[in-house]
């Protein structure tokens, strides 16, 4: 058999590339940079001046695991609401500023943990950098330079013809250089584009040229399904190379979904401790149970579980027993019944209509034996090191 490869690796599977070394920032009490865990952000969809609605949505995001939240500030009454929101929010608040530079100073005075500025559409921004740098420096907060393919500086559009990776990177480095000239270096950068390929290349170029922490995002990614695919592909390509320090999954959906997707992306890459993982077969003509419904019911029954548990839901005897044995808990179904596995051992066989109930009970039992909270309750705990 010598010289024949069976495709079995000789050692452990390869790991991701090491995190790219960056300077370190603090956004409120959340660290951003290579020495800190990768954080997950979202943005409120409420009118910021509606303080109660905005704080309520921030509470929902926090409970879902959001680490940092961004709020829009398009009008004077939105800026006026920032002091209360920044004070009462349980997680750091970033003010998102476009067009009007005066809102930057109001956000800093309001106590926001950071400010995102868009150099492509803030009036005469280059001429105001000195003032912004001093105000942010005096307050001890970072600035995110948020370059966006949809609002790139007209000078760069004329130079490159469109929002190319090179144009995005040049914009970001130019603006960062202006801040550095005035002694301000607490900067994070994003170079977002709606095309994941352009976005990935822009971040790769930026990562090679600077040591700023990078906020990853595919802008205008689209509805939940499309946006999840785009963000997962782009983030996976970058994070696997050690590029990226904080992420936001932009979806045309409830912002809580952004947190769920972002958290799952990080878990899938082992960049966050894994929690509940459902392994289920895609179903085929061999399936002897309704795998779709079974997997959905098990997932719903264990939603909010913080305990790291791999649950296999398999629909036939071909791959079912093997997958179930490799999981912490699993079922291999067939002939109107299911074999329940725990740590590779069959512990019982139950009728098909008792599979979901049995799996949920066993999951709780395993978690309780480990002294862990099995259901929702611990899910609001922020996992990022603060």
Curated annotation (Swiss-Prot):
Superkingdom: Bacteria
Keyword set, alphabetical order: 4Fe-4S, Iron, Iron-sulfur, Isoprene biosynthesis, Metal-binding, Oxidoreductase
SUPFAM superfamilies membership: Dihydropteroate synthetase-like, Nitrite and sulphite reductase 4Fe-4S domain-like
Cofactor(s) of this protein: [4Fe-4S] cluster
GO MF annotation terms: 4 iron, 4 sulfur cluster binding; 4-hydroxy-3-methylbut-2-en-1-yl diphosphate synthase activity (ferredoxin); 4-hydroxy-3-methylbut-2-enyl-diphosphate synthase activity (flavodoxin); iron ion binding
A Gene Ontology biological process term: isopentenyl diphosphate biosynthetic process, methylerythritol 4-phosphate pathway
Cofactor info, note text: Binds 1 [4Fe-4S] cluster.
EC number: 1.17.7.3
Pathway(s) annotated for this protein in UniProt: Isoprenoid biosynthesis; isopentenyl diphosphate biosynthesis via DXP pathway; isopentenyl diphosphate from 1-deoxy-D-xylulose 5-phosphate: step 5/6
Reaction catalysis annotation: (2E)-4-hydroxy-3-methylbut-2-enyl diphosphate + oxidized [flavodoxin] + H2O + 2 H(+) = 2-C-methyl-D-erythritol 2,4-cyclic diphosphate + reduced [flavodoxin]
Pfam families recorded: GcpE
Positions contributing to [4Fe-4S] cluster binding: 281, 284, 316, 323
InterPro entries according to UniProt: Dihydropteroate_synth-like_sf, IspG_bac, IspG_bac-typ, NO2/SO3_Rdtase_4Fe4S_sf
General function of this protein: Converts 2C-methyl-D-erythritol 2,4-cyclodiphosphate (ME-2,4cPP) into 1-hydroxy-2-methyl-2-(E)-butenyl 4-diphosphate.
Alphabetical list of PANTHER family matching this protein: 4-HYDROXY-3-METHYLBUT-2-EN-1-YL DIPHOSPHATE SYNTHASE (PTHR30454), 4-HYDROXY-3-METHYLBUT-2-EN-1-YL DIPHOSPHATE SYNTHASE (FERREDOXIN), CHLOROPLASTIC (PTHR30454:SF0)
Family from the record: Belongs to the IspG family.
Protein name: 4-hydroxy-3-methylbut-2-en-1-yl diphosphate synthase (flavodoxin)
């Amino acid at each position: 058999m010598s010289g024949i490869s069976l495709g079995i690796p000789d050692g452990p599977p390869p790991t991701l590339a090491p995190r790219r070394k960056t300077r370190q920032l603090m956004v409120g009490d959340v660290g951003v940079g290579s020495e800190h865990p990768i954080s997950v952000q979202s943005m409120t969809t409420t009118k910021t001046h509606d303080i109660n609605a905005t704080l309520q949505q921030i509470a929902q995001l926090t409970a879902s695991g959001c680490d940092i939240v961004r709020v829009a500030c398009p009008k004077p009454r939105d800026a006026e609401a920032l002091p209360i929101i920044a004070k009462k929010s349980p997680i750091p608040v970033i003010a998102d500023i476009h067009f009007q530079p005066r809102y930057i100073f109001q956000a800093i005075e309001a106590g926001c943990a950071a400010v995102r500025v868009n150099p492509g559409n803030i009036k005469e921004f280059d001429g105001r950098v000195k003032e912004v740098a001093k105000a942010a420096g005096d307050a001890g907060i970072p600035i995110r330079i948020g370059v966006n393919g949809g609002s790139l500086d007209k000078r760069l559009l004329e130079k490159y013809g469109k929002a190319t990776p090179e144009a995005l990177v040049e914009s970001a480095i130019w603006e960062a250089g202006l801040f550095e000239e005035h002694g301000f270096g607490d900067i994070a950068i994003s170079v977002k584009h709606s095309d994941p390929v352009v976005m990935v290349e822009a971040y790769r170029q930026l990562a090679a040229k600077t040591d700023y922490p990078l906020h990853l995002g595919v802008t205008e990614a689209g509805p939940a399904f499309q946006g999840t695919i785009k963000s997962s592909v782009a983030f996976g390509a970058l994070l696997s190379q050690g590029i990226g320090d904080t992420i936001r999954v932009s979806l045309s959906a409830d912002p809580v979904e952004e947190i769920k997707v972002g958290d799952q992306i990080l878990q899938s890459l082992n960049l966050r401790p894994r929690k509940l993982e459902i392994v289920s077969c895609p179903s085929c003509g061999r399936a002897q149970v309704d795998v779709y419904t079974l997997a959905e019911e098990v997932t719903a029954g264990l939603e909010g579980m913080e305990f790291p548990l791999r649950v296999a839901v398999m629909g036939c005897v071909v791959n079912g027993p093997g997958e179930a044995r490799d999981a912490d808990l699993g079922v291999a179904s067939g002939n109107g019944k299911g074999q329940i596995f725990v740590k590779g051992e069959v512990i019982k066989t139950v009728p098909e209509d008792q599979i979901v109930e049995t799996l949920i009970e066993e999951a709780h039992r395993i978690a309780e034996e480990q002294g862990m909270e099995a259901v929702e309750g611990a899910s609001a705990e922020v996992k990022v090191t603060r």
